[in-house]
Amino acid sequence: AEADALSPKVEALRYGPGIPKDGEKEMDFGPLITQQHLNNVTNYITTGVEEGATLLVDGRGKKPVGHENGFFIGGSLFDNVTSDMVIYKEEIFGPVLGIVRAKSFEEAMKLINEHPYGNGTAIFTSDGGAAREFAYHVQAGMVGINVPIPVPMSFHCFGGWKHSSYSTLNVYGPDGVRFYTKMKTTTTRWPNKYVIENAAFSMPTL
């Protein structure tokens, strides 16, 4: 059912120039960055087919009219992806979606937590208990509950866990402020001029 519902939506994704001209429709996504980037994404799709995943929507070789020399690729959709496949293990950085099937909530959680990457994840449910369990135990830096892409606003921290993290701090939010802040700590103590005290050489306490 998921694959049947997703296929027409992926096929309908519009790709073209990142900045449309007057009269042109807005695009869902633009071209990739370089020819090498396009080759990498294309090779991932080919690898997925060779490994046995079911390619439901193939975005390879798609070129918008008037932009045939651009680094374009259409949306692609795989079904029956398994955790031992390259397209599951590695980040593709292209418009390629893979459906991985799990038999239970616990199995799905295990798949996420055993993956080396942990940027963002989401759960869709009407069960508040399952949502709390997911948010508490899932090993990812950004969690969405009935939100498909859990990228927070700039006043929240943005970043992942595990191999999706590149620093002890994330970007945006309080971590972004800390990154650009040089801390200074000043400790002061003013004696009471009406109280005579002997000299003290220990750490002062309040």
Give the location of each predicted region.
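Conserved, charged catalytic cores of large soluble enzymes
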Residues: 8-13
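Short linear capping/connector segments at secondary-structure termini
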Residues: 22-28
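Short beta-strand to alpha-helix junction loop
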Residues: 31-41
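Conserved C-terminal structural/oligomerization subdomain of aldehyde/semialdehyde dehydrogenase
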Residues: 14-15, 21, 45, 63-206
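Cytochrome P450 fold signature focused on the C-terminal beta-domain
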Residues: 55-65
